[in-house]
């Protein structure tokens, strides 16, 4: 990860904070993250809080994400069931798979060549 070095001379009137090399959460886009949070809220209302943490096979999550991506790619922006953006649904699935790599490797049902 590459970050800019702290330049103390450019802002001598402000306090010093050594944060070189730390994650820059301030760079994340707010509106898309709010859309993803709406998906988590929708899921909590439909199922239960943190239901997704219990684990699903990776293929089911991947399949759902792909359906939302294809719907978007065909020109449909909003999911008719939830009223929320297809891309936010897909992002939820991708974030879930990232989490499952650490928390649910036993549910990895990908077909592995070789």
Describe every region a protein language model picked out.
Residues 1-114:
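Intrinsically disordered, low-complexity regulatory regions
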């Amino acid at each position: 990860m590459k970050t800019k070095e702290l330049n103390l001379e450019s802002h001598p009137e402000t306090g010093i904070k050594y944060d070189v090399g730390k994650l820059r959460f301030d760079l994340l886009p707010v509106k898309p993250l709010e859309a993803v949070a709406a998906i988590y809220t929708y899921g909590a209302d439909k199922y239960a809080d943190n239901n997704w943490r219990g684990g699903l096979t990776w293929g089911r999550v991947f399949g759902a994400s792909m359906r939302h991506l294809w719907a978007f790619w065909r020109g449909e922006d909003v999911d008719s069931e939830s009223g929320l953006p297809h891309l936010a649904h897909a992002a939820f699935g991708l974030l879930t798979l990232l989490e499952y790599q650490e928390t649910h490797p036993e549910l990895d049902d990908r077909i592995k060549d070789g």
